């Protein structure tokens, strides 16, 4: 199956390429491995075991990026600018700083304790042709509750790359989170997606 981006003008070249990658992959074992990786990772993040998440799920060479795409119609665009904007563009050291901040007893944002629930859906998995990289695309909903009246819900699409290490375990080497809002409707974005 092919997507003709000349005819389907709303489909970007990147999206067409990613669709084709996952459409041609029919490996059930790979799909199960991807689902297991993501649900274990979500569990660690839900219970706020951030150091364990860094140690067991995240590679030291990780690129962790949250972007927002242009949401205006083509007729409203007056200038040729990037259609994406970085919200976060972090490496392992920066993730370590964020984890340390979350675990700091002085962090007022965690008193009272914040509760998280993550829903990961539409998981698709495919192997990279040239490398031992597992590509995983998924949709994510994060529900964050603090006190009775502070509830935030985040929706996003994630494109991950997981690499198998020397110990045989896969770790996250790249995560691109496509956040569909240009302006956050939440108190803050101090979460890991």
Curated annotation (Swiss-Prot):
One annotated GO molecular function: dioxygenase activity
Biological process GO annotation list?
3-phenylpropionate catabolic process
* Organism of derivation: Pseudomonas aeruginosa
Q: Which SUPFAM superfamilies does this entry report, sorted A to Z?
A: NTF2-like
Top-level division of the source organism's lineage: Bacteria
Pathway(s) this gene product operates in, as recorded in its UniProt entry: Aromatic compound metabolism; naphthalene degradation
Name of the featured protein: Naphthalene 1,2-dioxygenase system, small oxygenase component
Q: How does it assemble?
A: The naphthalene dioxygenase (NDO) multicomponent enzyme system is composed of an electron transfer component and a dioxygenase component (iron sulfur protein (ISP)). The electron transfer component is composed of a ferredoxin reductase (NdoR) and a ferredoxin (NdoA), and the dioxygenase component is formed of a heterohexamer (trimer of heterodimers) of three large alpha subunits (NdoB) and three small beta subunits (NdoC).
A Pfam family (short name) is Ring_hydroxyl_B
Say what the protein does: Component of the naphthalene dioxygenase (NDO) multicomponent enzyme system which catalyzes the incorporation of both atoms of molecular oxygen into naphthalene to form cis-(1R,2S)-dihydroxy-1,2-dihydronaphthalene. The beta subunit seems to have a structural role in the holoenzyme.
Which UniProt keywords are listed? Aromatic hydrocarbons catabolism, Dioxygenase, Oxidoreductase
Q: Which Gene3D superfamilies match?
A: 3.10.450.50
InterPro entries xrefs? NTF2-like_dom_sf, Rng_hydr_dOase-bsu
